[in-house]
Amino acid sequence: MRWQGEGLLLDAKRYGETSALINVFTVSFGRRVGLVRGAFNKKNKVAIQPGNQLFLTWNSRIEESLGTFKVELIKSRYHIISEERIGLEIFNLIRVLCSIFLPERVDFDDLYHKTIMCVEGEHGIKEKLKRYVEWELQLLTSLGFGLD
């Protein structure tokens, strides 16, 4: 089994000496967790930062197994997110909520695009908070708890 696509890195945890388990939110494949071998070498170390947009290649023998990722950096957002406190707090909320509430391997295209809009760009505090509230409403709608 193999697929390729774009995704937002939510979290990376060290696994062994050189590998990492990454949690990504992808455009067409939903939230996925997989192993990146050599995650902390010179090539991948820059890409494996929360908030970065990655091109992912996922390989596995069968669909249900963990699988391995090969990653390529599309856009680095880590430095933009960590510049000011409110942006970092909003991104951390998004990471945690996606990791907890989104089931694995379920497609959430609308929420993915709203997430990118919320994380991306340099806006004032009011605009960032407005985008975050809109994102949370989209999360609730995507999970079936939308407001009328």
Could you describe each region identified by the protein language model?
Residues M1-A20, F25-D148:
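Non-catalytic alpha-helical scaffolds and adjoining flexible linkers that form interface surfaces
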